[in-house]
From Swiss-Prot:
This is Small ribosomal subunit protein bS18. It holds the Pfam family Ribosomal_S18. The gene is rpsR. GO terms for biological process: translation. The keyword tRNA-binding does not apply. One of its GO terms (cellular component) is cytosolic small ribosomal subunit. It comes from Dictyoglomus thermophilum (strain ATCC 35947 / DSM 3960 / H-6-12). The keyword rRNA-binding applies.
Length: 84
């Protein structure tokens, strides 16, 4: 009798997605302005949440600036906190 165990797990499939890139780095934007509402809306969901970095493809530096700019725009009532 053999003590060998057979593997019953299915092989893991990996998928390769397109390499995401930072929009702000490619356009050489150093400062994200909170008054540019149209640009900020592109990085928000329909419900008004900030899209995370792993989905948007932003670098860490620009994602921090983006979230600060969105929060400032919300405080100044340029963007809504919640969309119903």
């Amino acid at each position: 009798m053999s003590n060998e165990k057979t593997s019953t797990k299915a092989p893991k499939f990996t998928y390769s997605s397109k390499k995401k890139f930072c929009v702000f780095c490619s356009e050489k934007i150093d400062y994200i302005d909170y008054k540019n509402v149209e640009r900020l809306k592109r990085f928000m969901t329909e419900k008004g949440k900030i899209i995370p970095r792993r989905i948007s493809g932003n670098c860490a530096r620009h994602q921090r600036q983006l979230s600060t700019a969105i929060k400032r725009a919300r405080y100044m009532a340029l963007l809504p906190y919640v969309v119903k």
